[in-house]
Amino acid sequence: MEPRFKLWVEKDGLLVFSDYRAMLLDHIAKAGSISGGAERMGLSYRRAWGKVKEIERNLGVRLVRSEVGGPGGGQTRLTPEGEELLARYRAFRAAAESDVRRDFTEVFGRSR
């Protein structure tokens, strides 16, 4: 047996961040565009953009900055706040997962 859990962060009762949203920001950062990040997740551009805007609205910070293109096209990057949010969430998730595994082992014993 192995423990599984879902983790998300709320502010004033509103969902602001989760594994799904972290994955979206990560894909946007790696692709250099919202459309590329959306494609990697199998989402429409509109849905991905809506998720980013929802997070920004609920947190009150800007997470991505888009630059209009030149010869190579435009680019979207995470803002410093976006990078920090992603890094902190990953650290929080890793700590939570470690605690869940430890507690699971204490309660259920070693996995067979």
Language-model features: locations:
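Short helix-boundary/capping micro-motifs
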Residues: I28-E39
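Residue cluster at the C-terminal edge of the helix-turn-helix DNA-binding motif
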Residues: R57-R62
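Central "turn" residue of the DNA-binding helix-turn-helix
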Residues: G42-L43
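Key DNA-contact positions within bacterial/archaeal DNA-binding proteins
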Residues: R46-R47
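Short, Lys/Arg-enriched N-terminal segment that forms or immediately precedes the first helix
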Residues: M1-G13
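Basic, amphipathic "hinge/linker" alpha-helix immediately C-terminal to the N-terminal HTH DNA-binding motif
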Residues: S66-Y89
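Residues within the DNA-recognition helix of helix-turn-helix
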Residues: K51
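Alpha-helical linker/hinge and terminal dimerization helices associated
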Residues: L85-V107
